[in-house]
Swiss-Prot record:
One of its GO terms (cellular component) is nucleus. It comes from Homo sapiens (Human). Residues 66-82 have a biased composition (Polar residues). This is Melanoma-associated antigen 4. The keyword Glycosyltransferase does not apply. Residues 1-102 are annotated as: Disordered. Residues 1-14 have a biased composition (Basic and acidic residues). It holds the Pfam family MAGE_N. The gene is MAGEA4. PROSITE patterns: MAGE. Residues 110-309 form the MAGE domain.
Amino acid sequence: MSSEQKSQHCKPEEGVEAQEEALGLVGAQAPTTEEQEAAVSSSSPLVPGTLEEVPAAESAGPPQSPQGASALPTTISFTCWRQPNEGSSSQEEEGPSTSPDAESLFREALSNKVDELAHFLLRKYRAKELVTKAEMLERVIKNYKRCFPVIFGKASESLKMIFGIDVKEVDPASNTYTLVTCLGLSYDGLLGNNQIFPKTGLLIIVLGTIAMEGDSASEEEIWEELGVMGVYDGREHTVYGEPRKLLTQDWVQENYLEYRQVPGSNPARYEFLWGPRALAETSYVKVLEHVVRVNARVRIAYPSLREAALLEEEEGV
């Protein structure tokens, strides 16, 4: 099949004219120089894609436009496709020609919709409210209804990958969804009014790093892993706060981690282990499977560790 016979790009429901209007007005503005300079991009062996720092606060109320919703820590480049109708003419299959600039703007508009929807879902999570597909279409997706599967999938992936929040369908008939923390963990770090971003995703990464190292991971290994995400010892992070306090105090007090001196080390070195609450709520297998799902490279890099974890759980060790 030639490239001309492949699927067409999805467009807003109102057609080409509405698409052009959307490209100019519906959030397709390029980021400012300050926003680009403020973005912290990195890639992690545990978390695929490009991460960017999340601004400290969100705008109040439901997102109406990308200008009213700060960028989520994910940069997504994708194209939304739909299959041509059978029997359509070659010209219909090809669709209207678009310039590279229009293509780029349309992709950016879709990416902005992903950001909007992810923010909307985060608000639903904090409010402990269910959300329906109809509500998402009406309040966020709007003219991009044909692209809903892609936008919804990318937004859900972002929540799971970065914040450790899973979007689960609870009623297929009404397309109703609930948002819960991943892997059975009961912690999200939203303890005060100023806490707006769940921290479960970072906890899963730390637990995953420990699982990949065996029973424990040195402090150096943990900070090296977090460093590629832009999370550094002693440096305040927009989403996670002060990471050293989070790891060595908060999560230790919550019994998700143990932080102890390496026996016999002189000068003293420290290591992290799973705490009793982590062991009670989840397992090495679940954490490693989560890591594998968010980054297929882990399956290649750590196959023996994954097999060992599976065997360990089967034996009840």
